[in-house]
């Protein structure tokens, strides 16, 4: 009887494991989310697994043995409770497949009003307030210098959120 199971994949090999399992006629589910991150100094939307290194698979252990699944490239092991692989309820799989996250952001990405610290340049060590992005690779920060607030454009790689 077909059931859903949870696999733990080797680091960075989730996609490889999914491809090889799908070639063996195994249904796979790896829920993804889209995050807005600063990558190489530019603000971009990045698609990442909701559960890094975990892959939900549906198969019949009497047709495809668990050792075959376990020996697939990229797979580390089954998530188990005791000696046997844990069965994931179909209701959980259904909820994961229809789940559409809203406005998920990387906690390290600053937004207007967030406090940041400048890590490089002439104002290194100064605290500032993030006001707005200034193109793809820079941002406008509000610095308080001698009781006067000054807007200053800084590279996205030269500050971090507090």
Swiss-Prot record:
Pfam families: NusG. InterPro entries: NGN-like_dom, NGN_dom_sf, NusG-like, Transcription_antiterm_RfaH. Disruption phenotype: Inactivation results in increased initial adhesion and biofilm formation. Keywords: DNA-binding, Transcription, Transcription antitermination, Transcription regulation. GO terms for biological process: DNA-templated transcription elongation; positive regulation of translation; transcription antitermination; transcription elongation-coupled chromatin remodeling. GO terms for cellular component: cytosol. GO terms for molecular function: bacterial-type RNA polymerase core enzyme binding; DNA binding; regulatory RNA binding; transcription antitermination factor activity, DNA binding; translation activator activity. CDD domains: NGN_SP_RfaH. The N-terminal domain contains a vast hydrophobic cavity that is buried by the C-terminal domain. This cavity may bind the RNAP and become unmasked only upon binding to the nontemplate DNA strand. Interacts with both the nontemplate DNA and the RNA polymerase (RNAP). Monomer in solution. Enhances distal genes transcription elongation in a specialized subset of operons that encode extracytoplasmic components. RfaH is recruited into a multi-component RNA polymerase complex by the ops element, which is a short conserved DNA sequence located downstream of the main promoter of these operons. Once bound, RfaH suppresses pausing and inhibits Rho-dependent and intrinsic termination at a subset of sites. Termination signals are bypassed, which allows complete synthesis of long RNA chains. This is Transcription antitermination protein RfaH. The gene is rfaH.
């Amino acid at each position: 009887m077909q059931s859903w199971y949870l696999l733990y994949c080797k680091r960075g090999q989730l996609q490889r494991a999914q491809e090889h399992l799908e070639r063996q006629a195994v249904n796979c589910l790896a829920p993804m989310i889209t995050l807005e991150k600063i990558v190489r100094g530019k603000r971009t939307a990045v698609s990442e697994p909701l559960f890094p290194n975990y892959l939900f698979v549906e198969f019949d252990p009497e047709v495809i043995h668990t050792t075959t699944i376990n020996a697939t490239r990229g797979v580390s092991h089954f998530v188990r409770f005791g000696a046997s692989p844990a069965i994931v309820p179909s209701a959980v799989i259904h909820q994961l497949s229809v789940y559409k996250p809203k406005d998920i952001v990387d906690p390290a990405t600053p937004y207007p009003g967030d406090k940041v610290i400048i890590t490089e340049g002439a104002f290194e060590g100064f605290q500032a307030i993030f006001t707005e992005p200034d193109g793809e690779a820079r941002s406008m920060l509000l610095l308080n210098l001698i009781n006067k607030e000054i807007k200053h454009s800084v590279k996205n790689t030269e500050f971090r959120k507090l």
